[in-house]
Amino acid sequence: MAAAGQEKGYLTQTAAALDKSPSLSPQLAAPIRGRPKKCLVYPHAPKSSRLSRSVLRWLQGLDLSFFPRNINRDFSNGFLIAEIFCIYYPWELELSSFENGTSLKVKLDNWAQLEKFLARKKFKLPKELIHGTIHCKAGVPEILIEEVYTLLTHREIKSIQDDFVNFTDYSYQMRLPLVSRSTVSKSIKDNIRLSELLSNPNMLTNELKAEFLILLHMLQRKLGRKLNPEWFDVKPTVGEVTLNHLPAQASGRRYNLKVKRGRVVPVLPNIGSGGSSHREIHVKQAGQHSYYSAMKPIRNMDKKP
């Protein structure tokens, strides 16, 4: 009996051990998860970019060496533009001849090679866009990328730019509140970059740019005073006050003064003999033998009885 009890206890212990062991009970063990499959992950779109979705998808599908995070900065040296053209024309353009740098010399050298290639292929890119892209003008690199997209894919896209690009931050300043807008000196510093002064040290050109920015700032101030008269404490003129206080019927009425043809208003109406008379006076001037006559009206006042 004791041996039978020991055998039963040994069997129960082995059964419990078998139940707890994960290798011998695969149906009770948790399923082992494999490694996640690798999938193609596209980089996020650059922040505050005004490129259309079709252009962004086109850039993502080119498999560039690095995806642009800042459009103004990453396209200014022309390296990514050269890489895009190398993908479409691998036998006519070598990427090894371009340098991915940030200095002004590197930018000018890269764009000079690109301009030679574009002239050889008879591609037309406006020089204003190239100049604005080199000097990181706001909104200009997006237009240049769209032009390159149209040249290479022969597809037309609808630009999503809010307004026309004038190579200044005028539209950005107009969206700011009045307190946050820049002054004249700050506007000149923001819109004339140091790279522009180094690439074109002509003083006359830079003075003309500064004068244009000053005039643009004056127009911006005048427009701000018109749109926000309460902020600048602008008092209405007498004419504006009069128009505001006119009644509704009188202000909506238009008075057209029409003069009938053939009707003459007499300047000096004829008065009877008892009204007035004229007397001729001869005046002789010294040194002259001619006489001038003057008409002097004399009124005859009749006394009433």
UniProtKB/Swiss-Prot annotation:
Encoding gene (name): SPATA4
Tissue specificity annotation: Highly expressed in testis, the expression is observed precisely in seminiferous tubules.
Pfam families linked: CH_2 (PF06294)
Major localisation: nucleus
Protein name, UniProt field: Spermatogenesis-associated protein 4
Organism: Homo sapiens (Human)
Role: May play a role in apoptosis regulation.
GO molecular function: microtubule binding
PANTHER family to which the protein is assigned, alphabetical: SPERMATOGENESIS-ASSOCIATED 4-RELATED, SPERMATOGENESIS-ASSOCIATED PROTEIN 4
GO biological process: regulation of cytoskeleton organization
Domain Calponin-homology (CH): 49-155
Gene Ontology CC annotations of this record: axoneme; cytosol; intracellular membrane-bounded organelle; nucleoplasm
